[in-house]
Amino acid sequence: CALENGKHTAIEVPSAMNLEQCWSLIDLAEKTRLHCFILENCCYDDYEMNALAMAQDGVFGEIIRAEGAYIHSLEWFWDAYWKDPADNDVDNLHWRLKYNKENRGDLYATHGLGPVAQCLDIHRGDRFTTLVAMDTDPFFGKELVKEKTGKECKEFRNGDHTTTLMRTAQGKVVEIQHNVMTPQPYNRLYKLTGTKGYASKYPTKSYALSSEAMKGTGAPKIDNLNAHGFMNEEQKTALEKKYYHPLQRKYGEFGRNMGHGGMDYVMEARLVYCLQNGLPLDMDVYDMAEWCCLAELGTLSMDNNCAAVTFPDFTRGYWNKVEGYKHAYAPAEQEAKAEAAAKAYTAAQKKVTADFNLWSLYDAIKTAKNPKAAQKKYDKAVVKAEKAMAKALAQK
């Protein structure tokens, strides 16, 4: 385990699938005093970040309700998922369809939950207390297995569409949906309902504000404007320009053509930035647990006639010690120093890698007649490269 070996750790979503795994990661992170980061890229999408900036400035008033989802027809992807030879996949379903067949609940909650949890200051003044989940029967799921195996599917645990309702300690409500079965456009919902306005990302990125809330947003004044209709394009553009998130300004445009419209790059750049500058991460191990535990808690609810289930307090009582969700930033001088050191390190690493032919030596191990000798040659080159790199950095 990386944490047990002294390494800060980032885990792909969903990072934990049950309460035992959630608590195990928390206990280990606390024991080692190391970061455990959930790689939830949807928290860094442009609309979510801009809406977060608006929410933090009170544009929507008090956020009282939020919605998120992972609605994504996987029709074209089921057979592309890994087939684990040790998973007893006798029906050749590949891991993801097999997991849906064997497990009930929201199995992929964090894309929808993460961004709205930040807007609601979860673990920074509020926490989830109660959950109720409900699902449809697996109409599509059973037919899908029958189509792939040629046999009647008698047991399919996960419903085609799962809905989870959660209430917070401060009286807010969040609704999260999961559907990877039925044919419909991709949708993460992302809706914020506030006392002064409303934000909705799908099917089109929209905002609706009360006439009072419109004042001071920078949006052009329109007579008789109210929240019965969405803002027009001119107003929306002006609002988004004013609340264009600093992280999008710093990283977004550079990463625009990278993974998932740039949000992967922003997430990774932000993780590195926080580690380089010794800052709290945007998402910690407690967020990871809170967002991932829906899988098992939802199952408990649905397996007991959709009964209410109590959330564990993963923070051990510290959920209201920090006031409001915020991104941490280093002073400009420290930030510049850290960036310069990182660039120097990267340049030195690239130089010694080329000087000592490390990539070629590494690749040669796979095709070598004597792999042990090739590995030994590579290891010796790495030692020399590390010494040369240390010397180069010491001269900076």
Where are these regions (language model features)?
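Beta-strand-loop-alpha-helix segment that lines the small-molecule cofactor/substrate pocket
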Residues: 1-44, 58
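A short catalytic or substrate-binding loop motif that flags glycine-/basic-rich loops and adjacent residues
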Residues: 110-111, 155-160, 168-169, 183-184
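Short glycine/serine/proline-enriched coil/turn segments at secondary-structure junctions
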Residues: 74-76, 182-185
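Short, well-ordered coil/turn segments that N-cap beta-strands
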Residues: 7, 34-35, 62-64, 172-174
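Aromatic/hydrophobic pocket-lining residues that form π-stacking "cages" and hydrophobic walls in ligand
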Residues: 25, 51, 297
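C-terminal helical cap and adjacent loop that interface with cofactors, partners, or active-site loops
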Residues: 117, 185-193, 200-203, 210-396
